Curated annotation (Swiss-Prot):
Protein name from the UniProt record: Phosphomethylpyrimidine synthase
EC number of this enzyme: 4.1.99.17
GO molecular function ontology, one term from the record: 4 iron, 4 sulfur cluster binding
Keywords: 4Fe-4S, Iron, Iron-sulfur, Lyase, Metal-binding, S-adenosyl-L-methionine, Thiamine biosynthesis, Zinc
Native source organism of the sequence: Geobacter metallireducens (strain ATCC 53774 / DSM 7210 / GS-15)
InterPro entries: ThiC (IPR037509), ThiC/Bza_core_dom (IPR038521), ThiC/BzaA/B (IPR002817)
Residues annotated for [4Fe-4S] cluster binding in this entry: C412, C415, C419
Length: 436
């Protein structure tokens, strides 16, 4: 008997969630079903997420954008994180990941889930680590295997739609990293926790060793596995090295095991990657992971732009998505510097939405060009309201025009009376009047 979207799809059954996703994407329900059955499309929606909107991610669909929010040990203001969630969704984020590591994390997660109907992701390992330190008064390395899985169940029960789990961080991958040498070692927080735990306990990664236990939990909630890249490169110099690719090979093997068990999977990717290596990274992931949806952090194309990493992210994200990545995790101007502000979240979401939209045009996603064509028509007519309504960020567009002073001639203050549109309109009108 089918219990997950993947199992229903493989039995030829179109579910209500598939129909809802198809309507949102402008494709047929059968297109969604076929993609899910093949493992190239997923629908992120935990059966416990009552107010949640099913989110389809994958081949042939619009590129999605995720916004990371969450507290830290230094900033535990819940109201601020809820405002970030609202702002992210208002500006077009498709998903929100709660990465809270400070304050009442259970309360924060539940409040974020209640605040929005967007798709919600999390990293349950953070919860297990925090509980070990704060509740049990121990260290991260004192987490038990049961602690880790209890954290996963807690997030599943709360209605989290997808969880990042660093199952590919194994002893063999750590050895490859050591043997080859890396400039920045492990920059993934979950990956670092796992490596530390493995070294201290002289044991294999519990999420790898007990992967079947993980599948039982996620299948029960139809919760999507986002197989995390614990060895993602944290600088350009470490991109596409043996540790990164070895982990990707393992994730490809785990993808097959998960799909065989009826569990939906996506793969997380880098990271910091030079422009000329991005397409190769996408090709490798799609080949090694059997076409599973690819969820990338950036990638950032240079390491020297702190304060502007939403731009380095958008550049890499546009290239990655045009090459086949399906899901972009935003980066804010505060990346590498501080916990992002509400304004940082807004800028990060918009930057990644620009990248996603540009890539969708390049990929030929159905309907991707329609707004661009409409915008061109509005610009030609100097229809400012139409331009604002079509903008990715109408508020900023309106503000900038208002600040410059609205000219009587209807053009902008860049060209004024020498506006090319007005000049051409006058020229064409004169030709018509002359009978030409």
């Amino acid at each position: 008997m089918a219990t997950t979207q993947l199992e229903y799809a493989r039995q030829g059954i179109i579910t209500d969630k598939m129909k809802e996703a198809a309507l949102a994407e402008g494709v047929s329900p059968e297109f969604i079903r076929e993609g899910i059955a093949a493992g190239t499309i997923i629908i992120c929606h935990n059966i416990k997420h009552g107010n949640g909107r099913p989110l389809a991610v994958g081949k042939g669909l619009r590129t999605k954008v995720n916004a990371n929010i969450g507290t830290s040990a230094d900033d535990t203001d819940i109201t601020k994180e809820l405002e970030k969630a609202r702002v992210a969704v208002r500006h077009g984020a498709d998903a929100i990941m709660d990465l809270s590591t400070g304050g009442p994390v259970d309360e924060i997660r539940r409040a974020i889930i209640a605040e929005t109907n967007a798709c919600i992701g999390s990293v349950p390992l953070y919860q297990a680590a925090l509980d070990a330190v704060r509740t049990k008064k121990k260290a991260i390395v004192d987490m038990t295997v049961d602690d880790i899985f209890e954290g996963i169940i807690k997030h599943a029960e709360d209605g989290v739609d997808f969880i990042t789990v660093h199952c590919g961080v194994t002893r063999s991958t750590v050895e490859r990293m050591k043997n080859e040498g890396r400039l920045m070692d492990v920059v993934s927080r979950g990956g670092a926790f796992t490596v530390e735990w493995m070294a201290y306990n002289n044991c294999e990664n519990p999420l790898f060793e007990h992967f079947d236990r993980l599948l039982e939990i996620t299948k029960a909630y139809d919760m999507t596995l986002s197989l995390g890249d614990g060895f993602r490169p944290g600088c350009l110099a470490d991109a596409t090295d043996r540790a990164q690719i070895h982990e990707l090979i393992i994730l490809g093997e785990l993808t097959q095991r998960a799909q065989a068990a009826g569990v939906q999977v996506m793969i997380e990717g880098p990271g910091h990657v030079p422009l000329n290596q991005i397409e190769a990274n996408i090709l490798l992931q799609k080949r090694l992971c059997h076409g599973a949806p690819f969820y990338v952090l950036g990638p950032l194309v240079t390491d020297i732009a702190p304060g502007y990493d939403h731009i380095t992210c958008a550049i890499g994200g546009a290239i990655a998505a045009s090459a086949g990545a399906d899901f972009l995790c935003y980066v804010t101007p505060s990346e590498h510097l501080r916990l992002p502000s509400v304004e940082d979240v807004r800028e990060g979401v918009i930057a990644s939405r620009i990248a996603a939209h540009a890539a969708d045009i390049a990929k030929g996603v159905k309907g991707a060009m329609e707004k661009d064509i409409a915008m061109a028509k509005c610009r030609k007519k100097l229809d400012w309201e139409g331009q604002f309504n079509l903008s990715l960020d109408p508020e900023k567009a309106q503000r900038l025009r208002a600040e410059s002073g609205v000219a009587e001639h209807g053009a902008c203050t860049m060209c004024g009376e020498f506006c090319a549109y007005k000049v051409m309109d006058d020229a064409m009108e004169k030709q018509r009047a002359a009978g030409h």
